[in-house]
Every structure is written in structure tokens, then in C-alpha cells.
Amino acid sequence: MSFKPIDYLPYDFANRRHIGPSPAEMTQMLEVTGAANLDALMDDTLPAAIRQKEPLAFGKAMSEREVLEHLRRVASKNQVLTSLIGQGYYGTVTPPAIQRNILENPAWYTAYTPYQPEISQGRLEALLNFQTMVSDLTGLEVANASLLDEATACAEAMTMAQRVSKSKSKAFFVDRDCHPQNIAVMQTRAAPLGIEIIVGNPDKMDAEAVFGAIFQYPGTYGHVNDFTDHMAALHAHKAIGIVSADPLALTLLKEPGAMGADIAVGSTQRFGVPEGYGGPHAAYMACRDAYKRAMPGRIVGVSVDSHGHRAYRLSLQTREQHIRREKATSNVCTAQALLAVMASMYAVFHGPEGLRAIAQRIHRKAVRLAKGLEEAGFTVDPQAFFDTITVDVGPLQAAVMKSAVDEGINLRRVGETRVGISLNERCRPDTLEAVWRAFGITRADNDFRPDYRFPEEMLRTSDYLTHPIFHMNRAETEMMRYMRRLSDRDLALDRAMIPLGSCTMKLNSAAEMMPVSWRDFSLLHPFAPVDQAKGYTEMIDDLSAKLCQITGYDQISMQPNSGAQGEYAGLLSIAGYHRANGEAHRNICLIPMSAHGTNPASAQMVGWTVVPIKSADNGDIDMADFAAKAEQHAANLAGCMITYPSTHGVFEETVTEVTRITHQHGGQVYIDGANMNAMVGLSRPGDLGGDVSHLNLHKTFCIPHGGGGPGMGPIGVKSHLAPFLPGHEMTGGGEGAVSAAPFGSPSLLPISWAYCLMMGGDGLTQATRVAILNANYIAKRLEGAFDVLYRGPTGRVAHECVIDVRPFEKSAGVSVEDIAKRLIDCGFHAPTMSWPVAGTLMVEPTESETKAELDRFCDAMLAIRAEIADIEEGRMDAANNPLKNAPHTVDDLVSDWDRPYSRDQGCFPPGAFRVDKYWPPVNRVDNVFGDRHLVCTCPPMEDYAEAAE
């Protein structure tokens, strides 16, 4: 007897697992769309002129098992030594409870930015804990919910200082003891804005000549200085004082607020987040209350819901780029929410006593190490330090460094004659012995019990982390349950489709995520010798080659840490190109009115003037307006920024005409890669006339959104722009660093690399085709009930569609927000609201969603339309109905029901699961109350008790 062959690939072939609809379901969906097959649908959707000529030549897809084995082999080529290099990156211990329940938990890492507060209360509380931690440690009133890295935070603080300072100066003072990468990124940011950077000795600073100053605390070479007098001098001349501070050191040392600092920034990396060869890590920023509206980044605040119960939300959003555009405080979009949550949980896990004990142990080891070196005759500097010292070894520098490597230790090269040593949480007594041996010391007093090695007046006297949340979860059982309670309040991709237009919330597969936690990727210091990072080098080179093939560009830079930072880096490369050609005067950037808010904000950051371009009635770029303005500004045209396919969800046929006109008038073309999920394998921006693009690896290439970060936004360029890609002080060359580490956040790259390897070229192309199919299926199913605002010439949409709900405001008093909140009752995150057109919903299903989930969403939308019809026709009260009262909570269900519709209709609309229903923890959040009564730190414990009841 023989078995009949079954057409079934092994379970671990990702291209069968990543793509949601089965082949049979695709056939059914194609019938609904009216397309004969996928090829015909692609022909209808993409203009022939923009199709790429050759398929992706990646080879066949590898199975999950094969890819993981391959990644193990590559990772093993990295040599993970004990790095005592410091310079802003330190060994830390990630509590397994946090690694398992946060970092490796899809309930946390697949969530989106918490713009819909009712379904984001868990991570909003965790981020509020982060803000409280930062505010307490720095001694400043208001903190944000993270920035990309410490160097970026320094640059943001500099430009914030310029905004709020009353000084007329254009100069900014930088402490020479700042980390070199911080100085480099500030210099990059300052140049196009006309800010003069003065690097020098703080004691010789001319406070009258600057609008602000930044000081490193402790300094990059270990100095612990009191900057109180410097702050007073700055304030006397209406200038702003900034401190870039190590938060762990602040558990022992005088806080920046007590010195008079106006702004504090830094990295929370050593709060349980591994070095990761540079990232990702959550930077922080805190400031005085008077300056809170000028602070970049997201701020979590406390508000109330429609029943008066406490609720969290993102506050002061009118500062942000998606609203203010070129007038925004920054182009910050993606931040580091997941890493901020980890850092906050590290503080909750250890509490103030635990953090202080960790800091004390590190300091004692540093003092013990210094004493052993001094007793052996070495000169150690500084005398006052926290965890970092430098040692004068004269001509023996290279020998000592090599000897340390032989002992399994990386030290820092300082100048020509000194060696730097920074101790950390992972250091043990045998670490000190290995360092001593590298210096030729065979015996030292390892039992010495040292005192503090900084002046008594520098000891911190104020309390911190006094809120009960930092004192209540010592047992791991309670910690585990606390993290579970928070995640249960949220709606992430592990529960339901998140159909956010322009956000590409696709599957982040378990196999892709696994390598992030491997020690060979996670424990490498970004400034370790390059020969210790051979695995990273191989991976980055191969992934870069694949991305070049996908985009049609010639070179890739992995340095940008987000899409917005990629935009900034790309525009800097264009500016560098013009400058090299003697055309530095080119400073006009043409940007369509429909562009992402980051586009005009990024253009402003490189010192350009934004000239907006009108949209035609069909949503396309108004070509007459574009051509006229390109000609009008030809003498000064730097370039244009466009998104393709457009932000309206359509492949515009005029894209090559846009690029031709721009080049004709001397400009360069930036094609925003936000919608690359509709192009991979089908069309390449480099072939359309693009000179530079960024890629959102946290969209198209499967890095998870993490509730608002991490992200990566590498840029691809044509060869003529390659000399102007971001450089780094550790790698040399280029126009200047935009991130703290040479490759941004490289510990995320195994995710995108694994995705490419597991899908293969054919699989990546099929993913694009199915993403387009899914969007067209939704558009067709909703046809008749809702208008799709924009379509291509053949009636197709790209990978997303814009649903027009504006008529319902007039016919039934139903707003786009009402529909978004009603979708929560159905168990869905709302699509993108009021963008690119106010009063619309932009839907992007991605290729990962099954037909069943797409149908559930469509059923929910159609049921909502029926409810709107009931209001329109008088069958339902216009003010008291399921849409106006959405979302409904368990409290609503079990309380006295006095509404003119049933409990069942209110709480269990079509699309909602009855058994596994998601219940939002709060009713609709009051946005106005939250901004008028801004509270950005943890509320009193009584409020937590109330919530628990």
C-alpha cells in the first residue's frame, strides 16, 4: 500500500505561515474583487511603467529550522568578551522575569503606538512609570516617554534649548567630557541650523556667549563634577543648562535638578537592556515644568474617561510632527517604547533600594580596582568618579589593551597613552583580577572595603522612586502578575488585526524574534574591536545587499534608528551632495500636502524651506502645481519628498514625471519608504528616479512596533550620494553621525534578515501581492456601504484604502472617532484616523491576515454602517446610541442599564467574540481634560486601589 502524496510543505516554511490567506481563500477573494488571478490584479493595480524588470534573485526560501541554524553559525562568529569600554554602554543583567514577560512577549512587542488610549492602558501605565522614574532620578518635573538614543536626545535637548532660551546667541557650549558620539551627533544636528558648537572646558565657558550648554555627568572619562555654579552663570544670561546623566549614577549622586539644570537627558540602557552592539535602548529627557510644551517626543499623561474614572493618554499631541508638520518641536515619531517599558520594569523589579545597591556595588568595585592599580604604581584619573577611570600607561597602551583582550576583557583606548575602564553590573571579583593581570599586577587587595570616591557634597540627599509602584512587586509571582495585568488591558497583534494605514502591522514571527535574545547578538559592545563582530559584519553586509536589490539603490546605511531619522539622514546626504557641488544655496524642498508629517519636519531640521504642493481631486500630486513650483524655485531647489505608493493608497502614474521634473531643475528625489510593503518584488524606488529612500524595517521587514518603538530606518542611495551617507567616529568617513552607534540598533537586524531568508525572493514578492489583494478585498466588501475615497485608474487600491466617513457627521452626527471607538467594541484597533484626509479611516490589512479576520473586520464595519443608518432613519437616538457611548466596558455590562439599546447590542456587536471578547478597561478618554490638567507622573496609590476594585 502506498501513500497518496500530499501537497504540503514542512510546517516551518515561513512563506506558508507568514501569508494569511490560503491558496483556496485567495481564489475566493479574487472572485470578490473581480480579478481573474493575482497577476491580473497586479496588472490592474500597478502601472506597467513602474514594474521592475527582473524578479528578486535571493534563491529559494529556507525553512525556519535552517534559518535559525544559519543564524546560530553566523552569531557564533561574534566574539563576546567582557567589555569595560563604557562610553555610554555598560554590561547589565536583564532579569529573566522581564526578558520572558516583556521582551519576548507578543502582547508587548506587537502593540502599536498608544494613540487609541482606551486599548492601550497597560503600556501607558508602564510608560508613565518610566516617566516617573526619570523625573524622580533627575529631579525635574516632567519627563517624556523615551527618545531614540542618548546622542539623539542630546541633539534634541540642544534644539529645545534654542527654542526656549531668551538669549540671542547662536552658539551652544558642549562639555569636552561628553561622550564622543554625543558630540558628533550634536555637531551633525547643529550645522544645517546655523548653530555654532563650542567644545571646551566647562570652567572656561563664557555663559554670556551661548544660548545653552550641555554637561556629561559623570563625564566620559569618569569625572564627577558639580555643575551648580555653571547653571547659575547660564541662567544669569538667560541661557539653558542641560545635563546628560547616567541614571544609575543618579541613585548615588546629586541629581541635575538640584544643580539647577533645566533639561536632563541620558540613556536607560543599563536598566536591564543589553548592549546589543549599539541598540535599541531607550533614551530619556526631562525638563522643568515651564518648558514641557517645547519638549520633543511623546508624553503620557493622566486624564479621566467619560465616567470620570482615571485613564491614561498621550498628552500635548499638538507638539508632534503628525499635526505641526514643519513647525513641530522635532521629527520624532518612532521612539523606544518597548525598551522604556523594560527599563521601567527594571526599576519596579529592583526598587530604589535595589538600584542603589547595584550602583554601590559597581562603585565599590571601581574604587577597589583603582586602589590596586595605584598601589602598583599607576596614575589613575580622576580622583572623584563613579564607575569609570583612566590609567596612564605611557607607551604600553597597545600592549595593555592586547593583554586585556587575552584575558577576555575589552578596555577603551584614550588618547595615545591612557586606557579607560568602566565597570558595570556584570562585573565580578574575577573581572578585577583579570584587569589587574592585564596591567601586570599579580597580587592586589581584593578584600579592601572602600568608601565613596567622590566628595560628600556630591552624595544625593533627596528621595526617589517613592511611589508605591516601586515598592510593591518584590516577589516574582507578583511581578509576573503585574506585567500580565497590564498586557491584558491592551489590544495588540496577538489578539486581533491592527488595520492601521501606513503602519504595516504584519506578523512578527516567533522564529524571527528568537535571535534577538541570543547572547552572541545581545551582549556585544558597539565599540568593541571590529574583528570581534564578524558575525554582525556578515549579517549587515548580506542584508544590505538584499535591500539594495529590493530598492534599486547602490548603497545602504543602517545607522538611522527610525524612519524619521532615516528621512533626516537622507536629506543630509542630499545637502552634502549639493554642498560638494558648490550649490549649498539649494534649500527649497517640494512636499505634497498629503505627505507624512515627518517629511516637512525633517526638511526643517536640515535648514530647508518647505514649499507645499497641492493635491488633485483624485488625491494625486497636482502636476501643474508641482511643475510650476519646481520651475519657480529652480535656482534654489534642493529636492522633493514624495511617498510611493501615495499616502492615499494609490500607485500614481505620474511618479516618473515628478522625478524627471525635479532632476531637470537641479533637485534630488527623496522617496519615502513608508509604503514599501506594496512594492517589494514588484517595483523599485531607485528605478523610478529616486535618489534616496528610507526603509521602515519595523513595517515592511517584520521588526515589531513595540508599542511605539523600537524601529530602524536604514537609507538606500544612488552611488552619487554614497559619499554623503552618515559616518561615525568609530568607522570614519561620511557626512556625520545621526545615531549614537555606527549601525543604529543592530540587534534588531536578525529579525529582518531572517524574514528575507525564510521568505526568499519569491516569498517576499508574494507577500506584496497578497497585501494588495487583501486591501482590494476589503475595499470591495465595503463597497456600497462606504466610499473608498481614492482609487487608481482601473478602480484598484494599493496595499491600503481610505474610507470616507465624513458624510455621516452630517447625516447622523457620527464622527470618525465614534466609528473608531465602536470598532473597539468589535475587538479591533481602529484604522488610521483623519489622515491623510480629515474625517476618514485609512485601512491597511497587510499580507499576514487570514480571510476570516478580514471578514470579521468587514462584518464589523458593515454592522457599524447599519447602526448609522438606524440613526439616520430615526430608529436610534442621535445622542444616546452604541456609537456615541463606545467603547463599552465590563462595568457598563454589569451596571444598571438605562440606555435605549440592549446590553447585547452595545457590548457584543457583529465581529466581537463572545467567549474571548476584548474588554477595554476604560470608557472613552477625555482628551481636553488631560491637556488642561496635565499630570505626567504616577498618580497616588489610592487611584490604583480604585482601579483594582
From Swiss-Prot:
* Task of the protein: The glycine cleavage system catalyzes the degradation of glycine. The P protein binds the alpha-amino group of glycine through its pyridoxal phosphate cofactor; CO(2) is released and the remaining methylamine moiety is then transferred to the lipoamide cofactor of the H protein.
User: What are the GO cellular component annotations?
Assistant: cytosol; glycine cleavage complex
- What HAMAP family would the database entry show? GcvP (MF_00711)
Which Pfam families does this one have?
A: GcvP2_C, GDC-P
Q: How does it assemble?
A: The glycine cleavage system is composed of four proteins: P, T, L and H.
Q: What class of enzyme is it?
A: oxidoreductase
What's the protein called, per UniProt? Glycine dehydrogenase (decarboxylating)
In this UniProt entry, the residues modified to N6-(pyridoxal phosphate)lysine are 699
Q: Which family does it belong to?
A: Belongs to the GcvP family.
Listed GO molecular functions? glycine binding; glycine dehydrogenase (decarboxylating) activity; pyridoxal phosphate binding
Q: Which UniProt keywords apply?
A: Oxidoreductase, Pyridoxal phosphate
Enzyme Commission number(s): 1.4.4.2
Q: Which InterPro entries match?
A: GcvP, GDC-P_C, GDC-P_N, GDC_P, PyrdxlP-dep_Trfase, PyrdxlP-dep_Trfase_major, PyrdxlP-dep_Trfase_small
- Listed cofactors: pyridoxal 5'-phosphate
Q: Which gene encodes it?
A: gcvP
Asked whether the UniProt record includes Secreted among its keywords, one would answer no
